[in-house]
Amino acid sequence: MSAAIAAAESGGRILILDNNPQAGGQILRAGPIFPVPEMAQQKYQQIKAHSNIEFMFGAKIVAAPFAGQLLVERPHDSLNLSYRQLILCTGARELFLPFPGWTLPGVTGAGGLQALIKAGTPVKNERIVIAGSGPLLLASADTAKKAEAQVLYVAEQAASSSVRKFALQLWRWPAKIIQALSLPYRLYQPDSYVVEAIGQERLERVRLQTPKGIIEIECDRLACGF
């Protein structure tokens, strides 16, 4: 959306192709119990102020047969589009590193858990362990807590020294500070990672390597992201 707003100043016709049913991607996704974030609302208002910006939702590019041509697929049809300038904003892809038991029902990506919750999956009172590395863990924990889930543990694989360096930079992103402070310190453990997800027909508990040794936590969901 930011790219479209900047490009609209040229006066040309701007078309935003989005594979999602609404704008905002994963970061600004709303849902039944999650209102549209303020940042997204601001972007929507800016776009509405430009009559030369249009949206096409549920659309994805499947081919570029010729220079300046795109083949676009939608749920019920397909079409060819011509363009002079193309800006690709494909976002990031969540990295999921496999471990024993990673295919058990109840094991998802950290971003995947966020998407499920925002789409309406009920997690109230479910016991959740979040593991991996990076700020997405805090965001996933925050989303789960707002949906009334029980966040039992956040296992951060990065070393304590790296986490401290990251924490010193959080002043640049106030929202991340709020997410970090909303999680009890004892639940966030650096130098920790998943050894195994355990269960018969679905996830029952997770085995973690921590600075204090191997521990096992009974849980309903495990969300991992790197």
Residue ranges and their predicted role:
Residues I16-R29, I87, Y193-E196, R205-V206:
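Short N-terminal signal/transit or membrane-insertion segments
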Residues E94-L95, L137-L138, E196:
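Short, acidic Gly/Pro/Ser/Thr-rich loop/turn segments
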Residues I47-V72, A147-F226:
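A Rossmann-like FAD-binding core segment of flavoenzymes
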Residues N19-Q22, P32, K60, G91-A92, ...:
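Short, ordered loop/turn segments at secondary-structure junctions
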Residues M1-Q42, Q46, K124-N125, I130-W171:
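Beta1-alpha1 glycine-rich phosphate/pyrophosphate-binding loop at the start
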Residues A40-R127, R207-G225:
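FAD-binding core/adjacent interface of flavoenzyme oxidoreductases
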